[in-house]
């Protein structure tokens, strides 16, 4: 089984090996799954929706697609499943948190302190209120970029996870969640895609 493969249109999926997620005080088993290394980009989303309007900020092809509501994110997954012939979906909250923590037990995947956080997280203190290039921060131990900060990410349960470039660093974390209406769009909301192995 490969650790990564490239899929149309250019989404890189990393294998997240199964394990046990600690959610609150509970241990929850997690089956292996694939998760995109980065949130879906403008050029990837435009392949699904050519009429997609990019953020008003300067926006490159490989910048994250923002302003996407839950139904659009789910629609992208369904479309991607058809063109790739692979069952794609949004990650569950448990999968998302497990992938974010990357089997670490500290507050952040890089430790309990925010010292050095700027190497891993785009947040309100280091992002000049513009969508930052998410691939420019270091990945977590699972090889995933911008799991914390960057953009809020939709999950299958319509809950946003992780915080964004507008969130103060102290309010960002793998367990951070935000409940919004499914039609909520903002220039700090994006999404990743996932695929089960079975």
Predicted regions and their residues:
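A residue-level signal for beta-strand positions that form part of recognition/binding surfaces
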Residues: 10-13, 27, 32, 131, ...
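Short, structured beta-strand segments at or near domain termini in extracellular proteins/domains
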Residues: 187-198
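Short, solvent-exposed loop/turn segments at secondary-structure junctions
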Residues: 21, 40, 95-97, 165, ...
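Functional-site microenvironments in short loops/helix caps that host divalent-cation chemistry
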Residues: 59-62, 68-187
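A short glycine-rich, aromatic-capped structural motif
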Residues: 2-54, 67-71, 149, 195
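Compositionally biased, intrinsically disordered low-complexity regions enriched in proline and serine
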Residues: 6-9, 34, 46, 109, ...
């Amino acid at each position: 089984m490969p650790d990564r493969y490239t899929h149309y249109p250019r989404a890189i999926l990393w294998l997240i090996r199964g394990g046990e997620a600690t959610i609150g005080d509970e241990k929850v088993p997690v089956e292996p799954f694939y998760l995109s290394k980065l949130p879906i980009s403008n050029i990837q989303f435009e392949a699904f929706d050519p009429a997609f309007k990019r953020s008003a900020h300067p926006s490159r092809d490989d910048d994250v697609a923002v302003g996407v509501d839950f139904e659009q994110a789910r629609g992208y997954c369904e479309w991607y499943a058809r063109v790739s012939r692979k069952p794609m979906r949004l990650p569950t909250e448990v999968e998302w948190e497990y992938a974010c923590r990357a089997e670490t037990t500290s507050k952040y995947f890089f430790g309990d302190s925010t010292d050095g956080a700027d190497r891993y997280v785009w947040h309100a203190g280091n992002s000049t209120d513009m969508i930052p290039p998410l691939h420019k921060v270091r990945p977590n131990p699972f090889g995933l970029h911008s799991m914390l900060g960057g953009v809020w990410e939709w999950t299958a349960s319509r809950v946003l996870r992780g915080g964004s470039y507008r969130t103060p660093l102290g309010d960002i974390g793998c367990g951070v969640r935000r409940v919004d209406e499914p039609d909520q769009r903002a220039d700090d909301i994006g999404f990743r895609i996932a695929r089960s192995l079975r």
